[in-house]
Amino acid sequence: MSEQKLLLFRKWDTTEIVINDLGLKTAISLKQVIIPLDFGRSALKRYNKGQVNIVERLANKLMHFGKKYAKNTGRQGGKKHHSLNIVKTAFEIIHLKTGKNPVEILVRAVENSAPNEDTTRIVYGGTVYHVSVDVAPLRRVDLALRFISDAIKEATFSLSLIHI
């Protein structure tokens, strides 16, 4: 009996995707699921979010709308099914326009937008110095997904895109 592949949203295969960035191989999970839902099981251990599917992490980032004025409620607050439908529709549009696997395009976007260095503040005798430090792989993926989701939100609600 042959083993059946689990396709993401019953359409896209994640087994053939290769992660080119060696530092991100442990932080990007492409485990086979039909619907990327974890039900918060990853929150039980400290570094367990690296085991969560990258598509689910993108949907989680889309649910949070920013820190200013408690924007994690309202439009997308807690509506994960709505966020997953948005991601699924976006994947279908990407597949129609490019003809490629949209999960692979998401992985390439995360690899390209993940920062390698960041700055931190060091205080010596009242003087503040900014020192560059390397970024951990999980933080690199978190920042890349945050940059992507912020760009999505900015493009969605931008007034420059509205044609009068």
Regions found by a protein language model. Give the residues of each.
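Contiguous, often N-terminal, cationic amphipathic patches that form binding interfaces
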Residues: 1-56, 125, 129
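Conserved small/polar residues in nucleotide/adenosyl-binding loops
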Residues: 162-164
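Core subunits and conserved enzymes of cellular information-processing
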Residues: 94-99, 108-111, 133, 137, ...
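Ribosome large-subunit tunnel/peptidyl-transferase-proximal elements
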Residues: 33-104
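Acidic, compositionally biased tether/linker regions
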Residues: 51-53, 57-66, 118-159
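C-terminal end-helix/capping segment
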Residues: 100-120
